[in-house]
Amino acid sequence: MSLFFLSSDEFSKFVGKKLALTEEIYKKLKSKSFLIDHDSAHLDVLASRYWTKKSFLREFVKLHIFVLTLRCNSSCTYCQVTRQAESANKKIYDMSEETARRSVEIMMKGPAKNITVEFQGGEPLLNFNVLREVVLYTESLNGEHHKNISFVVCTNLSVLTDEMLFFFKEHNINVSTSVDGPRDLHDYNRCRKIKSARYDVVVKNIRRAQEALGRHCVSALMTTTRESFQYPREIIDEYIKLDLGSVFVRSLNPYGYAVKTQNSIGYSPEEFFLFYRRVLDYVIELNRRGIGFAEATAAMLFRKILTPWPIGFVDLQSPTGNGFAVTVYNYDGDVYASDESRMLNEMGDARFRLGSVYEDSYETIYFGQAMQLLAATGVAECLAGCVDCAYVPYCGADPVRHYATQKDAYGNRVASEFCKKYSLIISYLFEILRNADAETENIIWSWLNDAPVDRFEIDMEKEICRLE
């Protein structure tokens, strides 16, 4: 998308339709498709940009999540899954090989040529044999389907072995883990009762994975609790010390154990934003010192603001990515529209259950009532409170979250914490863009191009034109 700032007087003339056709501002707004006249060529350009922005819909589901087990050897205070103890019955809480194979067969019937297979839990490495079966069976079927397939395992790394690392290397499997910050904060958030995934273990195994797989194959995210508010700089310093190139500053989700602990570790959207702003300011400061490092939420939103390209983050997609961009295959064979849909089911509400790999075909899974509900409630451009919002091109609908918090998949934006959080963040990103000097612009573009800051000496206007 184009970037163009107006003064208050200029904006008033623009929305009041009082700009003269000969004014330079009129010409510039037209050239950037903020207004159109009877020149159909500009409408064609705008249509092309819009189609590109929504191109994540072309291939349908590209992210396939396999929940290998509900068993876990950690005790995170904010766990959004109804986890089970590591000693729990494997026959009940682990995905079987038969379930895995049926899930893979459903996945491979989809039209997408580029797919990501993501392994989750619980702690997915507690069921490593089935992880291996999913990878090998997927690769065997792909001889016929010719898809581009990537794999990632989301793990606390506590049970990582050399055998696993060898398999990951052999099959190009990336690792995503969790680091909440320095030792005391990480262990406070994630290891109060069970110490298996304590800081020292995670750090040691991050370094093992980086050495075995390569730095670019290991990523991490952090989850924000009230305790995190004290350590915005220390959290980022920890990521840099671990040679992790970016951080995803994640807020709490309204599912699982996180609901029960909300009073002790939770916060308002406004409180989260104040923390997030301190983190982002520090990240930009570090980049100014020549330390290349990105914050994932800002990078995704800048991509939506500054380029015509889509993003793969389900929460910020419209039409919703729930069911249309992601599918979850649960340990028991049930299929869900998203990870959040699966978590909602663990809390006793199966509204967004799509079907079962044992009972349903590809067609009945994706054309059932749950998908119809998601289609009806998942287009932000058509929802009350979104349709007239200036930020709707950069936001998402997320009907599952709104149903979880409001018991209404359409959602009331006035009462929506999702809406409040992203409105605050997007407003701040526009403030950064408005005040950006050349160095800040280079930093932002380095995030979008995933390259070192010092490689970029970019004129933002020219770069936007190139991308469009």
How would you name each of these model-derived features?
Residues 1-28:
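Short amphipathic alpha-helical interface segments
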Residues 3-4, 24-65, 83:
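N-terminal [4Fe-4S]-dependent radical SAM core
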Residues 58-60, 65-95:
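Canonical Radical SAM [4Fe-4S] cluster-binding loop centered on the CxxxCxxC motif
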Residues 68-75, 123-126, 386-388, 392-393:
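Cysteine-centered iron-sulfur cluster-binding motifs in ferredoxin-type domains/subunits
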Residues 80-85, 215, 390-394:
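Detector for the c-type heme attachment site
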Residues 100-118, 127-254, 258, 264, ...:
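Radical SAM/AdoMet-radical enzyme domain recognition
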Residues 189-200, 207, 211-323, 328, ...:
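Radical SAM enzyme [4Fe-4S]-AdoMet core and its adjacent flexible, acidic
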Residues 345-468:
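Flexible mid-to-C-terminal extensions adjoining Fe-S/redox cofactors in radical SAM and related proteins
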